[in-house]
């Protein structure tokens, strides 16, 4: 049965992925910068920064492929979690990536910045 909890996004890796390994268990976190489909009042592009994570074989593959400033397509599920930090209850919403596709390998940050026009995505 197909789940209705699914997302798809195309964006730019905006910081190097952080890989963790504990007892043969792999985990990676990264952030994807995506362009909104409208401009700010100053006619500048607006962005969202999606916090993503992946586990296991997907994490290992992402570690090998993802570098800062490459353009990727990702898909997976949205999940929320609750945790305590300094005795304060906090919530986080994260994207659990189960599939990914590098789209354009870039050599310079400017290539990712060229995806700033809302009409391009």
Please place each PLM-identified region on the residue numbering.
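Short, acidic/hydrophobic/Gly-rich beta-strand patch recurrent on exposed beta strands
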Residues: 29-34, 51-53, 94-96
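Acidic, gly/ser/pro-rich intrinsically disordered tails
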Residues: 1-5, 10, 16-26, 39-45, ...
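OB-fold and OB-like beta-barrel modules that bind single-stranded nucleic acids
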Residues: 7-15, 32, 68-79, 97
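Beta-rich strand-turn-strand
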Residues: 55-90
